[in-house]
Design a protein with these regions (language model features):
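Glycine-rich, acidic/polar active-site loops that bind/position phosphate-bearing ligands
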Residues: 1-168
Length: 168
């Protein structure tokens, strides 16, 4: 029994034990927002990991509608029970692939595949042998923000109580 088969058996057992009713497959769209494909647990089987779940990639910003047939391949190693779902739900992340006559291949613009290629390039070029990628969630709160654009000038003005210039 290979590692994936063992993990799939573990997932099936977890679904029975936790009375899972839905399987939620998570991916990011081209802008980095979470997207979901959700199926009832009855439709979930080993073929899901082999053939994936088909979806229209144009809805996610991945492809024009004429070439939008894509497949989501779940990664069993990412499975967990969603503690916030109102219905018992198992969640998994995975990979997005394009459908081709030669078989499915990873979609080169999917953020996960971009990062995998970056890691591969880094290792091949000898830059490093390990990479840590972390998103930086950053935002600013302004009390006022104004801008002006005229034929001779443009500019902006921002102000916030927390700014150094507002403290004496």
């Amino acid at each position: 029994m290979d590692k994936n088969t063992a993990k799939i058996t573990e997932i099936r057992n977890l679904c029975q034990e936790k009375q899972i009713r839905m399987i939620d497959f998570k991916m990011t769209d081209i802008d980095g927002r979470w997207r979901h494909i959700t199926i009832p647990v009855e439709r979930f089987c080993e073929d899901t990991f082999t053939y994936g779940i088909g979806f229209d990639g144009s809805n996610y910003g991945y492809a024009p509608i004429e070439k939008s047939d894509m497949v989501f391949l779940p990664d069993p190693a990412t499975a967990y029970v969603d503690p916030f779902a109102s219905v018992p739900t198992l969640t998994m992340c995975g990979n997005v692939c394009t459908i081709g006559q030669d078989g499915n291949r990873p979609f080169d613009q999917y953020p996960k595949n971009v990062s995998l290629r970056a890691v591969e390039y880094m290792k091949e070029s000898g830059i490093a042998d390990r990479m840590v990628i972390g998103p930086e969630f950053e935002f600013y709160l302004f009390d006022s923000a104004r801008f002006e654009v005229t034929p001779r000038q443009c500019g902006y003005r921002i102000d916030t109580r927390q700014a150094d210039w507002n403290h004496s």
